[in-house]
Swiss-Prot record:
GO CC annotation terms, alphabetical: cytosolic small ribosomal subunit
UniProt function note: Binds as a heterodimer with protein bS6 to the central domain of the 16S rRNA, where it helps stabilize the platform of the 30S subunit.
Entry keywords, A to Z: Ribonucleoprotein, Ribosomal protein, RNA-binding, rRNA-binding
A GO BP annotation: translation
Highest taxon of the lineage: Bacteria
Family annotation (Pfam families): Ribosomal_S18 (PF01084)
Keyword Ribonucleoprotein in record: yes
Protein name: Small ribosomal subunit protein bS18
Subunit structure: Part of the 30S ribosomal subunit. Forms a tight heterodimer with protein bS6.
InterPro entries referenced in this protein's UniProt entry, alphabetically: Ribosomal_bS18, Ribosomal_bS18_CS, Ribosomal_bS18_sf
Organism expressing this protein natively: Halorhodospira halophila (strain DSM 244 / SL1) (Ectothiorhodospira halophila (strain DSM 244 / SL1))
Amino acid sequence: MGRFFRRRKYCKFTAEGVKEIDYKDLNTLKNYITDTGKIVPSRITGTSARYQRQLARAIKRARYLALLPYTDRH
């Protein structure tokens, strides 16, 4: 009775047919990091393992090139 329908998670990259996640696409990458700068795990975002690895690599590259912050502004 008290249950509610939970929407199924799906990989947006697989649905869109993305070949490679670009480290310069900051608008996409910002959706996958928290306010404190941590990478959001795939069990929360629904990203497949292949794209989660690409995502982590792209975020780390963007951080190294100072396109994304390592931590929040404190």
